[in-house]
Amino acid sequence: PAWAQDAALELAQARQAVDKATQADADQYAPDLIGLARQGLEQAQRAAGDRRERKNAPAMALRAAADADLARVRSEEATVTAQLQLRRNEVNQLQRQLSTGEDRR
């Protein structure tokens, strides 16, 4: 049936989204969201194997993928914000060195 193909596709996409979020350090920067995504993926996988719940599996997998995508984006945002702060600190340090005459020859 078509819903079985949908479930397989949605489950694969959800697994991929969870993997991408994990690679983006979501466990560190968005632990609640990645946990929710993993839990949702497990529920979708169980539903896919249960005759009575099988039709719900695609929607459950979509939700898990959305949670994983959000976890990945939040993690990437935290990483970029940290890098930006590091660069600002470097600029401030260089400005202080220039204004105090350090490193002049």
What is the predicted role of each segment?
Residues A2-R105:
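Long, charged/polar, soluble alpha-helical segments
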